[in-house]
Amino acid sequence: MNRHADVPVIDISGLSGNDMDVKKDIAARIDRACRGSGFFYAANHGVDLAALQKFTTDWHMAMSAEEKWELAIRAYNPANPRNRNGYYMAVEGKKANESFCYLNPSFDADHATIKAGLPSHEVNIWPDEARHPGMRRFYEAYFSDVFDVAAVILRGFAIALGREESFFERHFSMDDTLSAVSLIRYPFLENYPPLKLGPDGEKLSFEHHQDVSLITVLYQTAIPNLQVETAEGYLDIPVSDEHFLVNCGTYMAHITNGYYPAPVHRVKYINAERLSIPFFANLSHASAIDPFAPPPYAPPGGNPTVSYGDYLQHGLLDLIRANGQT
C-alpha cells in the first residue's frame, strides 16, 4: 500500500477578511505545510472547478489534429513564432500528454512589454471562435479568477514570512504578470508510449522536477498521480477535485534563501483520461525581490537579487533541458 504525504486542507477564505488573528492562524498553517511536505490544498476559494473540468474536457475532445498543429508552439511547428502560448503536441510513440498554454490576457499589441519585445511576453492566440464558441471568454475569466486566488494565498505567505500582508502586491499585478495557465490532458491509450522509470523503479509520465514559478495553484482530476520527494522517499499526494493544490516554486525558494523550498515532485504513470490545470503564478518581468529569511532562520550567506524576467527565461530553458519539451 502506497504511503501518503501530509497535505493539509487549509481554508483560505479568512485571508480576505479583517480578522488578523484568523489570518495569522492561516499563515501559520501555510508555513507548516511549506516547511513540511511542501504542498497544501486551498479550500473555500470561490472558483467553480466542476465547470472548469467540464469545459476543458469538452474543449479537448472537440479539437481536431489540424487545429492543434496550427496552434502548436515553435518547438513542434517551426512556422509558429510563439514559445509559450499555444498547443503542446502529443508525439506518437514518445509523449502521450498534450496541452494548451495561455498567458496574461492583458498582453495585447499595444502593451508596453509587447512593444518592447521582452522575452516570455506573447499576445495569446486562440482556437477559432466559430468552432469553439466562448472558449476565449471562459479562459480569460478563469485566468482572472485563479489570479485572485493566488493573490489571496500570497497574503498568507507574506504574513508567514513576517512581512506586511500586501508584500507581494506591487510585484503581482494583472497588468503585467508573467503567469500562465496550462490545460493539460493525459489520455487513456491502448498503446502507451515507452515509460521512463524513477530510481526506485516507479513508472513515470513526467520525471522529477521543481516548478518554475513563485507559487503554483493546480486543479486536477481526482485520480492519484503526483508524488513528492521526502526524507522517507517518494510519497503519494492525496487527490481532491474540490480544492486547489498549492506549492512553492523555485523563485519563492530563492527569495526566502531556502526557507520555503520548492518541493521535488513527479507524475506517476496512470493510464486514465484526466486533466491537470496548473496556474503558474509569476511576477512581472522587472520585479526583483531582495532575498531574505524570516527570523530566526538565517542561513549563512544569501542568494543574489534576480529579476523575475531573467529567472523565468532561464528557469524554463533549464526545465526543458532536464525533462524535455512538455
From Swiss-Prot:
Pfam families: 2OG-FeII_Oxy, DIOX_N. Fe(2+) binds at residues 209, 211, 265. Removes, in the presence of oxygen, 4 hydrogen atoms from delta-L-(alpha-aminoadipyl)-L-cysteinyl-D-valine (ACV) to form the azetidinone and thiazolidine rings of isopenicillin. InterPro entries: DIOX_N, IPNS-like_FE2OG_OXY, IPNS-like_sf, Isopenicillin-N_synth_CS, Oxoglu/Fe-dep_dioxygenase_dom, Plant_2OG-oxidoreductases. It comes from Flavobacterium sp. (strain SC 12,154). It catalyses: N-[(5S)-5-amino-5-carboxypentanoyl]-L-cysteinyl-D-valine + O2 = isopenicillin N + 2 H2O. One of its GO terms (biological process) is antibiotic biosynthetic process. Keywords: Antibiotic biosynthesis, Iron, Metal-binding, Oxidoreductase, Vitamin C. N-[(5S)-5-amino-5-carboxypentanoyl]-L-cysteinyl-D-valine binds at residues 84, 88, 186, 209, 211, 276. The keyword Iron applies. Belongs to the iron/ascorbate-dependent oxidoreductase family. PANTHER family: OXOGLUTARATE/IRON-DEPENDENT DIOXYGENASE. The gene is pcbC. Residues 183-283 form the Fe2OG dioxygenase domain. 2-oxoglutarate binds at residue 274. This is Isopenicillin N synthase. Its cofactor is Fe cation; L-ascorbate. It is an enzyme of class 1 (oxidoreductase). Isopenicillin N binds at residues 84, 88, 186, 276. GO terms for molecular function: iron ion binding; isopenicillin-N synthase activity; L-ascorbic acid binding. Pathway: Antibiotic biosynthesis; penicillin G biosynthesis; penicillin G from L-alpha-aminoadipate and L-cysteine and L-valine: step 2/3. Its EC number is 1.21.3.1. The keyword Oxidoreductase applies.
